[in-house]
Amino acid sequence: MLIVTGGAGFIGSNIVQALNARGREDILVVDDLTDGTKFANIADARICDYLDKDEFLRRIASGDSFGDRIEAIIHQGACSTTTEWDGRYMMENNYAYSKTLLHYCLERRIPFLYASSAATYGGGQVFCEEPQYERPLNVYGYSKALFDQYVRRVLPTADSQVAGFRYFNVYGPREQHKGSMASVAFHLRNQLLKDGSVNLFEGCDGYGDGEQRRDFIYVGDVVDVNLWFLDHPEVSGIYNVGTGRSQTFNDVAHAVLKAHEGGELQYVPFPEHLKGRYQSFTEADLTRLRGAGFDGSFLTVEEGVARYMEWLQQN
């Protein structure tokens, strides 16, 4: 059996779909469906069971084996709202929760794959998986960086796989429940359908209008990385998961406009509350990921957004 936490969320539900495509249905999905709209992400999935996160944690704490051999825990469950400033809530959901699962897995030699984030780098300009480059700009990034630091301390004595993935700007199907935290491609499409135009921020930090650059990665490529590590339980560590190629927000906007054959691009003032807390540039250093043996390719913004817009039109 495989356990996917956050399995009704964005990346987690895409992992479940990919496991189904492999013929796997022995999947326990763990999530918090307080936001009931997330059910849509797993309504078409084939799973063996569902557990609420709180019940799951109670059973983990009691040492429950869940009645079956656990092949791996793929931990995607977390609070991913970068504008959330309730530090106690964030540390409980992202740090303490992850530590509990990590030790459960280590004690039973169960592979543990988990979601970290490029938010650990914050305002830095070097995106290499080393502590000196970690400068989080918000408590979300800090919660992820702190758990990565914890993992580094236990890895030397771990007898089973522990692999963390620093996701960069992920976009694609099944993110509609994320609201303000959904990708820029998702929001631009909604703007275009509503107003016939799309809005980007004016320039900041020395970048021109819409020229801020991020490493945008299609969710299907993120899933491929997770499944590669699932297939290679001998590989542990913390890895960047991006394309290794930054592109501009203008690139995303033009890809959305192209998919809909028209529309206007406008620029709006940069929000005051984001100044000093905004990553104007990210680009994953993939040296460590490639060195681990992953040789998969990644879609460009143009390719990924086109695929995503087609999926949205069909669903």
From Swiss-Prot:
InterPro entries in UniProt: Epimerase_deHydtase, Heptose_epim, NAD(P)-bd_dom_sf
Gene3D superfamilies cross-referenced by the UniProt entry: NAD(P)-binding Rossmann-like Domain, UDP-galactose 4-epimerase, domain 1
CDD domains attached to this UniProt entry: ADP_GME_SDR_e
Active site location: 140 (proton acceptor), 178 (proton acceptor)
Gene Ontology terms, MF aspect: ADP-glyceromanno-heptose 6-epimerase activity; NADP binding
Any single Pfam family the record assigns to this protein: Epimerase
Positions annotated to bind NADP(+): 10-11, 31-32, 38, 53, 76-80, 93, 144, 170, 178
EC numbers: 5.1.3.20
Chain residues that bind substrate: 169, 180, 187, 201-204, 214, 278
Catalytic activity, as annotated: ADP-D-glycero-beta-D-manno-heptose = ADP-L-glycero-beta-D-manno-heptose
Cofactor note: Binds 1 NADP(+) per subunit.
Domain notes: Contains a large N-terminal NADP-binding domain, and a smaller C-terminal substrate-binding domain.
The protein's assembly and partners: Homopentamer.
Family to which the UniProt record says this protein belongs: Belongs to the NAD(P)-dependent epimerase/dehydratase family. HldD subfamily.
Protein name: ADP-L-glycero-D-manno-heptose-6-epimerase
Organism of provenance: Syntrophotalea carbinolica (strain DSM 2380 / NBRC 103641 / GraBd1) (Pelobacter carbinolicus)
